[in-house]
Swiss-Prot record:
GO terms for molecular function: electron transfer activity; protein-disulfide reductase activity. One of its GO terms (biological process) is protein folding. Required for disulfide bond formation in some periplasmic proteins. Acts by oxidizing the DsbA protein. This is Disulfide bond formation protein B. The gene is dsbB. Disulfide bonds join 38-41, 104-131.
Amino acid sequence: MNPFRWSFRAQFLLGFLACAGLLAYAIYVQLHLGLEPCPLCIFQRIAFAALAMFFLLGALHGPRAAAGRKVYGVLSFIAAGVGMGIAARHVWVQIRPKDMMSSCGPPLSFLSETMGPFEVFRTVLTGTGDCGNIDWRFLGLSMPMWSMVWFVGLALWALYAGFKARRSSVHH
């Protein structure tokens, strides 16, 4: 079973299942291992959820026209690209010298109650405190680094599935 030969629907369903699995693991780590997500982690979860939504919509719709598949591929790529940007920022915060760290500021719940959405987004992306802590590693990579790997892989998968030439199922 070569996933590169699967139908568009099956390929996008696989993308959705990957995102759902990653989100489920993030929730497991939070609830059972006790690691509280920082604001950048939460934004990465939102990006994975958006990516999962586009993968699921594409899988359910399963457009026959190449243009429709390309639209889903591009939308998924954009969601993954946003996630890559957030993960890259998080990795940068984690690898910079500790003496350059500043306060992360108040929790995300407080920010969302006292600021508009764009100001919250800007504040979170400039904050660095808790976001700089590395509490979890697997094969030497922190969770934001793994998020980056997954965002890149899923972005490429979305483009492959969306732009792959497909044989017509209509026989002449």
